[in-house]
């Protein structure tokens, strides 16, 4: 019986992913999802209390990955800024971006292009503001740890950098860049970003 329940849940998740990608959150109805899953509408609600709850379950691995990237890079227990000088830093950052896109491509498309009307519709704006605060706090922490680190950057410039990251993701996804081209674009982005930050921080 438990196996049947697990299989049913997987069918619902698979069918709803396809429908959300095709029609968007607003266009896909719970009736559509139930029909595509081979379950009754009432049974669908047994597994997920609402369409929004189902949408959030589908996208949670992707949103968790983005939150994790922020915490690892700029959280209070994240990287020390001195790591930016290591030769391995650029490759590590590139691998992190590539990994998120490879593992969560369809979910990122839903999050960035198909989430209108859901509780995740404003995720991009929420994340940009959170990342801006996080990076500013991280810079303050780094200045207390490294007495020779003396540079100023405006809050809005940090905000723009976070917006730029999402623009990069959106363009890669919108144009369905193949893996090799995605890697080349991300390599240029990471190189450009690191050269700029090193110049600004005089390191």
Please provide the spans of the model-predicted regions.
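Amphipathic alpha-helical packing segments from all-alpha helical-bundle domains
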Residues: 96-103, 118-144, 156-163
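Helix-turn-helix
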Residues: 11, 15, 19-53, 57
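Solvent-exposed, amphipathic alpha-helical segments
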Residues: 15-22, 65-76, 107, 164-172
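Hydrophobic/aromatic-rich alpha-helical bundle segments in the mid-to-C-terminal region
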Residues: 109-113, 121, 139-192, 201-203
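N-terminal intrinsically disordered/low-complexity leader segments
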Residues: 1-4, 201
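Short, basic, alpha-helical segments at the C-terminal edge of helix-turn-helix-like DNA-binding modules
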Residues: 5, 30, 60-67, 72
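Hydrophobic alpha-helical connector segments
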Residues: 57, 71-101
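An amphipathic alpha-helix signature
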Residues: 91, 95, 128-140, 183-194, ...
């Amino acid at each position: 019986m438990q196996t049947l329940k697990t299989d049913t849940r997987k069918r619902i998740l698979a069918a709803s992913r396809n429908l959300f990608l095709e029609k968007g959150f607003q266009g896909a109805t719970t009736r559509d999802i139930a029909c595509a899953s081979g379950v009754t509408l009432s049974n669908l609600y047994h597994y997920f209390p609402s369409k929004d709850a189902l949408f959030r379950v589908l996208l949670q691995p992707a949103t968790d990955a983005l939150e994790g990237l922020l915490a690892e890079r700029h959280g209070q227990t994240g990287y020390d800024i001195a790591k930016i000088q290591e030769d391995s830093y650029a490759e590590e950052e590139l691998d992190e971006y590539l990994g998120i896109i490879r593992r969560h491509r369809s979910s990122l498309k839903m999050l960035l292009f198909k989430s209108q009307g859901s509780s995740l519709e404003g995720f991009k704006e929420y994340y940009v503001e959170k990342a801006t605060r996080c990076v500013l706090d991280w810079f303050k922490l780094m200045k207390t740890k490294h007495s020779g680190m003396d540079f100023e950057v405006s809050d809005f410039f940090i905000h723009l950098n976070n917006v730029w990251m999402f623009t990069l993701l959106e363009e890669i996804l919108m144009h369905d860049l193949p893996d090799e081209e995605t890697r080349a674009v991300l390599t240029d982005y990471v190189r450009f970003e690191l050269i700029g930050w090193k110049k600004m921080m005089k390191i």
